[in-house]
Amino acid sequence: MSPRARRCTDRCARMSERSMNATTETPTGKCPVAHGTGGTQNRDWWPNQLRVDLLNLHSPKSDPLGAAFDYRAEFKKLDYEALKNDLRKLMTDSQDWWPADFGNYGPQFVRMAWHSAGTYRLADGRGGGGRGQQRFAPLNSWPDNVNIDKSRRLLWPIKQKYGQKISWADLMILTGNVALETMGFRTFGFAGGREDTWEPDQDVFWGSETAWLSHRTLEKFDAPLGATEMGLIYVNPEGPDRNGDPISAAKFIRETFARMAMNDEETVALIGGGHTFGKTHGAAAESHKGPDPEAAALEAQGLGWASNYGTGHGADTIGSGLEVTWTQTPAQWSNFFFENLFKYEWVQTRSPAGAIQWEAKDGPDIIPDAHNPEKKHKPTMLTTDLSLRFDPIYEKISRRFLENPQAFAEAFARAWFKLTHRDLGPRSRYLGPEVPREVLLWQDPVPAVDHPLIDDADAAALKAKVLASGLTVSELVGTAWASASTFRGGDKRGGANGARIRLAPQKDWAVNQPEQIDKVLKALTRIQGEFNLNASDGKKVSLADVIVLAGNAGVEEAAKAAGHDVSVPFAPGRTDASQAETDADSFKWLEPAADGFRNYQKDGLAVPAEVALIDKAQLLTLTAPELTVLIGGLRAININVDGAKHGVFTDKPGALTTDFFTNLLDMSTQWKAAGESNDVYEGRDRQTGELKWTGTRVDLVFGSNSILRALAEVYAASDAKDKFVTDFVAAWTKVMNLDRFDLA
């Protein structure tokens, strides 16, 4: 374990100790909560306990709609135009309990949509608006999401009307689009297809800070974090750690937006476009604000931040503490943001709540009041707005947008679409009448199938040629795994479709063993070429399909070597992407720092290898049983990087046996660390001391962790051989098809 990983676990232990020391006993010494969720929990006692439970998230047990519910089918029944018309009416239907600024809810709905999608992180594909997670903690109570609860509550009558024909996840993004359109902006398009989840994501690492708005320096701003302070979407609008410095703020803006896959032009367009509308809220000190939604009283009914200042809403609203309105037409698209940014000199001032902001020096009173048509204000800006003028790179882009409003509008439309659709996945998932026709590079496009597909007889013939090619079972299975296991369940990127394993950057990743991959792919490409040259009726097979088919052939051979006759399911229809259709800079983030399924980890891994294994399994949407059976099977076949013998607890490598489990759980073997790093272990005969096996932390955790051991015992039992092969084939097929949304 690296020193960094050890510090990580020690910090968790200290946090838990502080928590336990802060508890108090009741006068009687009895538990004050007489139900199963009360009292000290396992993680209070063992804070470093492996989070196997993360693999159980979003199970059918938490879904009220049931396994038979088909969201795609329901969405297609939606009266899309009627819904949009209802949303248009909502924009100016101001409610007394939460009056609309400038008589238009549009700006706050733009913010709602932005903050739903804006949690996306390129590094691990998590976050974003694709699951409707803004409804749940922690996002529903982040300081940066103050009063967005009101936006969702305003939407509830419309969600109630259309029911399950549109998810909350889709509705929040669509509402942002409609808001922009009603304020005179032409959007790039909209695609539905986001399915709601029904409980908070527990797998997203938002940071280890224990206080809201804890500042992170650039030096400590580790991936995959996408915000500079705990509880913010991106950066502190007052500047880093509230320093009021636009220049230093620009560095943080550039870093955070890059982690969301946005370049400098997209960043400037998004900030300028978003701040064309609406205002911030800082009518008085934040001490007037009540608790956030998760901490609010029962009778608040899920609403938070109730204010005791004045009316608590309208002109008296307290949100971020800043009191800024950027443009003369805050409910209408314009170029006033950039015009004001460059027209005035700016002096630092304070909002009524005491937050750092900027006011136009000697500026005229031209900015409308949000609730009093008789009042006007001087132009105001945030520290982070001024970054677009005083950072030399941002300044050039901003001036171009100032001089060319059409270029600004086009850039904002495209950046907004990317922001709100980045985690929706490939175009095959897109639904609705407003899906743009243009194919965009960041969508990871693959060509459409333009030929008849192979049938079962063709697949059998291809597998026979693969097995006669001289490639080993390990090479076939390992290559297919390398191709398919790049999939990430968060943003639906990666997977075998496209055969991008043959392209940069994947072909050069150390985990993919470039020399071996090159050898295997050359052989498979020859087989593909021969088939396509000689096939009748115009049939063709893609290399992507051949890679998966070859892996299936390897699994079948491994099962045969263990005495089992199985047929691994196969669905043709993958196509091969080109290098021009592959954004290498974006795909580099899919390279695994660790892949426990191949017993691989980079030097200096930031977390223990078993933690990285759970993370990888969760990205692959695997359950704990699926994780367990895959590890056992892949160790038996031995797809370890560089052919390492760690975890290959068998004298029959290449056969799909349960030997990994039986030998790991064999009490005649005693395990000890092989070095100070505690990354590799030796298993010796308990009586003679003879070395029998070597294993990694990933291998040994299936005997150490109580949950994983319980699962390992199932497959180590004498009656489990058939079940093991059946379960392995099912889990293998799942991984091979993770990106086959066309099969749904």
From Swiss-Prot:
It catalyses: H2O2 + AH2 = A + 2 H2O; 2 H2O2 = O2 + 2 H2O. One of its GO terms (molecular function) is heme binding. Formation of the three residue Trp-Tyr-Met cross-link is important for the catalase, but not the peroxidase activity of the enzyme. Its cofactor is heme b. The record marks 111 as: Transition state stabilizer. One of its GO terms (cellular component) is cytosol. GO terms for biological process: cellular response to hydrogen peroxide; hydrogen peroxide catabolic process. Binds 1 heme b (iron(II)-protoporphyrin IX) group per dimer. Its EC number is 1.11.1.21. Homodimer or homotetramer. This is Catalase-peroxidase. The lineage of its organism: Bacteria, Pseudomonadati, Pseudomonadota, Alphaproteobacteria, Hyphomicrobiales. The gene is katG.
